[in-house]
Regions:
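ATP-dependent carboxylate/phosphate-activation module, predominantly the ATP-grasp catalytic core
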Residues: 1-29, 60-91
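Generic detector of bulky aromatic hydrophobic side chains
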Residues: 4, 8, 43-46, 95
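Acidic-enriched, low-complexity/disordered segments with a strong bias for Aspartate over Glutamate
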Residues: 24, 51, 58, 101-104
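Structural motif corresponding to the C-terminal cap of alpha-helices
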Residues: 30-31, 98
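Conserved metal-phosphate-binding beta-hairpin within the catalytic cores
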Residues: 32-68
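Residue-identity detector for glutamine
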Residues: 45, 79-82, 98, 102
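Cysteine/selenocysteine-centered motifs that mediate thiol-based redox chemistry or coordinate metal-sulfur cofactors
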Residues: 89-108
């Protein structure tokens, strides 16, 4: 299979916990192998089989997407009460880390 385009999508709610656990496992594995671990946005580029098995085929260690695809997540509104792009979220997280004197945890 080859990637032939980008289409934003949301995941079935019944699969959301599985997807989030995959992300958590990736973060933990990277932290174990390459301290301090991954800092910043990433995407586990995946496919879902007809049997609803999730298969990661690539990791994008940057803000995922392309200029044509919106750079926001449908879940941002649930967490923050509003919709905005990844850049604003990163800025908010940096500001919060500064206010909490935790910049050393998010900057290398």
């Amino acid at each position: 299979n080859i990637e032939v385009g980008h289409t934003p999508a949301s995941i079935r709610e019944s699969l959301l916990e599985k997807v989030l656990k995959m992300g958590d496992k990736f973060v933990a594995a990277v932290k174990k192998e390459y301290a301090p671990g991954i800092i910043g946005p990433f995407s586990l580029q995946s496919v879902i089989t007809k049997d609803l098995e999730l298969i990661v085929y690539d990791v994008s260690l940057r803000v995922p997407g392309n200029p044509i695809v919106a750079t926001t997540s449908p879940y941002t509104k649930y967490q923050y009460g509003q919709t905005f792009g990844v850049g604003r979220r990163i800025a908010m997280e940096i500001k919060r880390a500064q206010e909490e004197d935790r910049l050393d945890e998010i900057v290398t």
